[in-house]
Amino acid sequence: MIAAVYTLFFFFLLISSVYSKATISISPQTLNRSGDIVVIKWSGVESPSDLDWLGIYSPPDSPHDHFIGYKFLSDSPTWQSGSGSISLPLTNLRSNYTFRIFHWTQSEINPKHQDHDHNPLPGTRHLLTESNQLNFRFAVNRPEQIHLSYTDNINEMRVVFVTGDGEEREARYGEVKDKLDNIAVARGVRYEIEHMCHAPANSTVGWRDPGWTFDAVMKNLKQGIRYYYQVGSDLKGWSEIHSFVSRNEGSEETLAFMFGDMGCYTPYTTFIRGEEESLSTVKWILRDIEALGDDKPVIVSHIGDISYARGYSWIWDEFFTQIEPIASKVPYHVCIGNHEYDWPNQPWKPDWAAYVYGKDSGGECGVPYSVKFNMPGNSTEATGMVKGPQSRNLYYSYDMGSVHFVYISTETDFLKGGKQYSFLKSDLESVNRSKTPFVVVQGHRPMYTTSRKIRDAAIREKMIEHLEPLLVKNNVTVALWGHVHRYERFCAISNNTCGERWQGNPVHLVIGMAGKDSQPMWEPRANHEDVPIFPQPANSMYRGGEFGYIRLVANKERLTLSYVGNHDGEVHDVVEILASGEVISGSDDGTKDSNFGSESDFAVLWYIEGASVMVVGVIFGYFVGFLSRKKKESGVGSSNRSWIQVKNEET
């Protein structure tokens, strides 16, 4: 017995001595801001395995299996020598980082320990080495994740940002970059782990301190003027100076970028899959914003399934860091989706919706969404948690140029007799069509889609029964939806039937193609290539498999929507609607397979005053996109006859 104990002791001593030879270093040990790169180097890894991995931890005392993310050492071309390096851009999580290297082999894979995509999570049995701590300069104090939104007042702009502490902050702003004399005091709020509804959001695996969210309203703005601003305090430090163009009530022009279901990319593997295509969406929209020049107000509209954090709170930090180059320049408006709100005990869950609303929020139940954004209006609903804050940003509206924009919630009560229905009815009936001849309604789950997702059939039926009569009666121009991760444009439709071009029924578009990739290509059956799995019905004018976004441009006479693909940054589909409601292009005219002109052609519509600038931007953007693109789905976006089978979204 004693001999066996000694044998076991010396065995573990031997294993320890083998594994203890590894060393790790990081450079630099202090980063300035989110997005800065750290280089992690290691050496002395004995008998390296292609499953050896680098764990990323914040805060530094996190248990081994509570990583932020990981990278396999085999990502380094020299890993087989036992040495290598990996470069990572990091986001400021308001706490320090450490990095740990683990040895892992095929024989140690636990098939029951899986991530969201059913891939095995890495084993933590054999720790080889751990780095010193890495910190961000002014990590707690620095304001980050800056994003703008409109308020209910035409002469205001809201700015929201995050810091590590709740001490006093403000926004200072002005018309001259070095003369920011106007002050707006910021209000700080936060949420806690007990406000979350279930795991992983309320578990130690998914929870990280979200910091303080500050909200300041810049008031008394002149209309159509570029303002400069920064946020922070003299005591704690200031952000960089950003700028925006204020709303202009006298302008007839409306410019917007619109999409759903974008998410964000992470430079590491984590418990849930990141959305690599979201990088291209941000890149092309940023190109378009910069091409507009200095005097045009623009909005971004993200209609649900925002970050796809699903209970892993640091993903919200990654998301806001990714969109800050856009959202610090133009208002970033949102509506709630299933991955922000849904949980099993949500207050409104009628019998017909028993299989519609699940646990897609990962236990967040609308709390981070409600705290991190502040949209116009004052719509609220209870989360269903005794301690939880109310859900906000559910339904609201505002005017911009010639368009009245309306946002609704498909995750909370929208039936006749409810608060949201009353809001929508009153709002649509009170639109001044001489001022805003176009009305655009947006929500997450689609009223119309050729997806055969059985789980959502009941909600589509209820939306057509309760909401569609309001849209038709009040001559809504366009209805935009997400949730299905593809682009699809319908005719001017009512009760599943196309009307005449001049009748003025709403044109419905599904635009959930900004990043989420959980749905594969619609392809014909192998033994029946002439028969698509989901045939395109007569009321579906165009279906596209290319990731991308929508551009909206409108004046008093005409509204144009263009579908821009991420692969090439070019326009793949266009629909134009007159103020009378007549659809004058993009109708069912026998040209379903055609594109509606090149990017330079669209520039004439989109940037009438700056076509030459846009053409240069397109050429530059095309080559940047081509060079930076790592992968491309074969045939995607080339024709609407290359069908894509829409599978059920992950549950």
Curated annotation (Swiss-Prot):
Its main location: secreted. InterPro entries: Calcineurin-like_PHP_ApaH (IPR004843), Metallo-depent_PP-like (IPR029052), MPP_PAP (IPR041792), Purple_acid_Pase-like_N (IPR008963), Purple_acid_Pase_N (IPR015914), Purple_acid_PPase_C_dom (IPR025733). Zn(2+) binds at residues 305, 338, 444, 483. Fe cation binds at residues 305, 308, 485. It holds the Pfam family Metallophos_C. Gene3D superfamilies: 3.60.21.10, Purple acid phosphatase-like, N-terminal. Glycans are attached at residues 32, 96, 202, 378, 432, 475, 495, 640. Coiled coil: none annotated. Keywords: Glycoprotein, Iron, Metal-binding, Secreted, Signal, Zinc. Binds 1 Fe cation per subunit. GO terms for cellular component: extracellular region. GO terms for molecular function: acid phosphatase activity; metal ion binding. It comes from the Eukaryota. Residues 1-20 form the signal peptide. Its cofactor is Fe cation; Zn(2+). The keyword Metal-binding applies. The keyword ATP-binding does not apply. Substrate binds at residues 338, 483-485. It is found in: Secreted. PANTHER family: INACTIVE PURPLE ACID PHOSPHATASE 9-RELATED, PURPLE ACID PHOSPHATASE-RELATED. Homodimer. Belongs to the metallophosphoesterase superfamily. Purple acid phosphatase family. This is Probable inactive purple acid phosphatase 9. It comes from Arabidopsis thaliana (Mouse-ear cress). The gene is PAP9.
